[in-house]
């Protein structure tokens, strides 16, 4: 993808991160943080174990991922990962996930994991599997 940059956000702006969460998650039933205040966002974003990266094509924001490095469990949890609709079908999801996984493996965890569900983008699971992830557990939950 021409002019693609993926950068760690050193200054984790709660308003910007909330915007990304809302805008990207609106079609995928991301609801758990909608009621968070900016202070709650700030507290979450300032955790030392959190990494928050933004993908840009040129100067346009195209997506993001965040993960938590659970050193005590030797695990990295990709907590959110998504791209704007305008970038669907262009291969950006694969690049962004590969970046997240490479970054996560730098922590030397025993595993990297992500929750996904049937409400996610139809290609999400295929993307995870294509990058070496496996289905660990399936469960039915009512939303």
Model-derived features: positions:
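A conserved beta-strand-loop-helix scaffold within acyl/acetyltransferase catalytic domains
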Residues: 34-39, 45-52, 56-85
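Short hydrophobic beta-strand segments in globular cytosolic domains
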Residues: 62, 135-136
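Conserved beta-strand-loop-alpha-helix junction that forms the acyl-donor binding cleft
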Residues: 88, 114-124, 141-143
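Short acidic/polar active-site loop segments enriched in Thr and Asp
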Residues: 51, 110, 134
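Conserved acetyl-CoA-binding loop-helix of GNAT-fold acetyltransferases
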Residues: 80-83, 89-104, 125-130
């Amino acid at each position: 993808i021409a002019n693609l940059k993926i950068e760690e956000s050193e200054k984790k702006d709660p308003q910007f991160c909330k915007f990304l969460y809302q805008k990207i998650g609106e079609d995928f039933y991301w609801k758990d943080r909608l009621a968070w205040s900016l202070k709650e966002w700030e507290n979450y974003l300032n955790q030392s174990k959190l990494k928050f990266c933004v993908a840009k094509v040129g100067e346009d924001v195209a997506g993001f991922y965040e993960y938590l490095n659970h050193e005590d469990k030797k695990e990295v949890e990709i907590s959110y990962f998504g791209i704007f609709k305008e970038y669907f079908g262009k291969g950006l999801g694969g690049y962004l996930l590969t970046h997240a996984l490479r970054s996560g493996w730098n922590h030397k965890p025993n595993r990297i994991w992500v929750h996904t569900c049937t409400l996610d983008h139809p290609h999400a699971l295929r993307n995870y599997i294509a990058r070496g992830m496996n289905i660990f557990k399936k469960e039915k939950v009512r939303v």
